[in-house]
Structures are given as C-alpha cells and as structure tokens.
Amino acid sequence: MMKISYENKELIRHIQDICWRINQYTDYVAFYHFSGHVNGFDIRVCKSKEDYNNRIYAKELYMNLFEDDELYNELSEILETLQGYENGSKEVQVSETSI
C-alpha cells in the first residue's frame, strides 16, 4: 500500500469533515465511502436529503494511481468543489468523474 503524505492525509480529513458539514448545515446530502482494500474513495453529493438518488456531483478516486503531488492536486480540487456546495455557491448540475 502506498504511503500517503501528511498534507494529503489532512486534505482527506478535511474532505470527510466537509461531507459531514454538508449533511448537517445544507439541504444537500453528501456520501463518503472509503475502500481500504483498494486505497480509494467515492464521494457523492445529491440534490437533497429526500432526493438522495439525484446526484449532482460524484467523484471516485484511487489514490495508488497518483504521485504525491498529483494526489494533492486531485484532493484539493475535490475539497474546493465540496466547499462550493457547503457555501451554496455551486449550481445544481451533474458533474460525474471517475479516476
């Protein structure tokens, strides 16, 4: 298994935290699933807690596929996107990517 830098671990913690905050403080619902056996995770943001099958953002990331600096950039982009949903500055649109 790949060793993850401290900076990237912190970004992962922030991503988990912001998913929790999205669920607590917005009308959206966020899902964060970690799969330790493949060192990957899946994040989804859905339109509302009642309409939790209507995805507006989805990202799947396998950390072993990236060098440390590339992983940092990917995690930073995810965090920035999630912050947009938390702050209400993201428009409701489907943005689905998979790596």
Each predicted region: which residue ranges?
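Negatively charged, low-complexity tracts enriched in Asp/Glu with abundant Ser/Thr
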Residues: M1-G40, K49-I99
